[in-house]
Amino acid sequence: MARKTNTRKRRVKKNIESGIAHIRSTFNNTIVTITDVHGNAISWSSAGALGFKGSRKSTPFAAQMAAEAAAKASMEHGMKTVEVNVKGPGAGREAAIRALQAAGLEITAIKDVTPVPHNGCRPPKRRRV
């Protein structure tokens, strides 16, 4: 029987000038996904994927590092300008936006797309620490 050669598909370098940076900032983590204008993912990163564990994932510094990593990966595909969609109540919202700008991406618009219920599900009980 012929042996299969273990070949991995190489990433194709796309040439995309502008896109959308989706920042999902929760109380536990920050996920940054950079897509083209149609919503196809070009690069992504998160605080957890960079090795932050536990409560360190929810820090603004972790969000900054995640945004930098995603921005660098997208700039390899020719990305220059991004619109930013921010979702969630987390600590890393502003830090991630600043990191995208510092990495060299030009930010054209910032939108808050946090879903707000029209009085839907009951929220979790308040924490008593």
UniProtKB/Swiss-Prot annotation:
One of its GO terms (cellular component) is ribonucleoprotein complex. GO terms for biological process: translation. Signal peptide: none annotated. InterPro entries: Ribosomal_uS11, Ribosomal_uS11_bac-type, Ribosomal_uS11_CS, Ribosomal_uS11_sf. GO terms for molecular function: rRNA binding; structural constituent of ribosome. Keywords: Ribonucleoprotein, Ribosomal protein, RNA-binding, rRNA-binding. Located on the platform of the 30S subunit, it bridges several disparate RNA helices of the 16S rRNA. Forms part of the Shine-Dalgarno cleft in the 70S ribosome. Part of the 30S ribosomal subunit. Interacts with proteins S7 and S18. Binds to IF-3. Belongs to the universal ribosomal protein uS11 family. This is Small ribosomal subunit protein uS11. It comes from Anoxybacillus flavithermus (strain DSM 21510 / WK1). The lineage of its organism: Bacteria, Bacillati, Bacillota, Bacilli, Bacillales.
